[in-house]
């Protein structure tokens, strides 16, 4: 039921941004919407709800509303995998950010050298999380980039750090048949706005991200309060290490 609601929400929001989708992607999303409606009818015997109810519940599960936003400004980047550097094309704002979570007030140290992001990769259930910054401030802003062909990926969620205005990670589903399969694989890793993992290394690093977010005193705000943020950072500096 939860998976169906999530798919209903994403399909609806993606189709609201048709001008940002190519014809092939739009057809795949329409197909996803049709199959999700079929699942909803099948589930109606034990979980009766309307299509609109499914969308609303999916929005809550996804930890916020998809909003309009500008793409972060950055130079073309590449990521090194197995000794080779692959270029990455970040789409402008195919799908706007997920959630309205405020910033996480911790220092962000980009692991950035020129146009090369030295990335740490974590594998989980057919998807790969690549962490590109030495910080725990995963703002739940995710850029949806269908079919980045040069890396031969079918789907990518790009995580964006509001503290440094830079990409801090991205989650990809590799070697999948279509956009719906890619989204489903990523959903296995994303629950209510948080990335989940089962292997020990991924679990440790991602639990620290989640716990850090829960400790953020401004987590409940819809938008960051700049004055409070500056005051909080000043108090941390005055307190010392």
UniProtKB/Swiss-Prot annotation:
> By which gene is this protein encoded?
NS
What's a GO cellular component annotated to this UniProt protein? host cell nucleus
Identify the stretch annotated as signal peptide in this record.
none
Q: Does the keyword Zinc-finger apply?
A: no
Compartments, record wording: Host cytoplasm; Host nucleus
Looking at the keywords, is Lyase present?
no
Entry protein name: Non-structural protein 1
Q: What job does this protein perform?
A: Suppresses the RNA silencing-based antiviral response in Drosophila cells.
Top-level taxon in the UniProt lineage: Viruses
Keywords annotated in UniProt: Host cytoplasm, Host nucleus
């Amino acid at each position: 039921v939860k998976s169906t609601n999530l798919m209903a929400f994403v399909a609806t929001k993606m189709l609201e941004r048709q001008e940002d989708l190519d014809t092939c992607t739009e057809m795949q999303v329409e197909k996803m919407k049709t199959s999700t409606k079929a699942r909803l009818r099948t589930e109606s015997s034990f979980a009766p709800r309307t299509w609109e109810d499914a969308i609303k519940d999916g929005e809550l599960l996804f930890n916020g509303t998809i909003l309009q936003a500008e793409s972060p400004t950055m130079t073309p980047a590449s990521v090194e995998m197995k000794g080779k550097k692959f270029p990455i094309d970040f789409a402008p704002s195919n799908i706007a950010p997920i959630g309205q979570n405020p910033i996480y007030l911790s220092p962000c140290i980009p692991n950035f050298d020129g146009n090369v992001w030295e990335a740490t990769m974590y594998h989980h259930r057919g998807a790969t999380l690549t962490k590109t910054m030495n910080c725990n401030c995963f703002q739940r802003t995710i850029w949806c980039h269908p079919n980045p062909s040069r890396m031969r990926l079918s789907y990518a969620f790009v995580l964006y750090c509001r503290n440094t205005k830079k990409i801090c990670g991205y989650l990809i589903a590799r070697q999948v048949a279509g956009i719906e399969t890619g989204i489903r694989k990523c959903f296995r890793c994303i629950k209510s706005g948080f990335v989940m993992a089962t292997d020990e290394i991924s679990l440790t690093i991602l639990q620290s991200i989640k716990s850090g977010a829960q400790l953020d005193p401004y987590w409940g705000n819809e938008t960051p309060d700049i004055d409070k943020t500056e005051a909080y950072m000043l108090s941390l500096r005055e307190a010392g290490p």
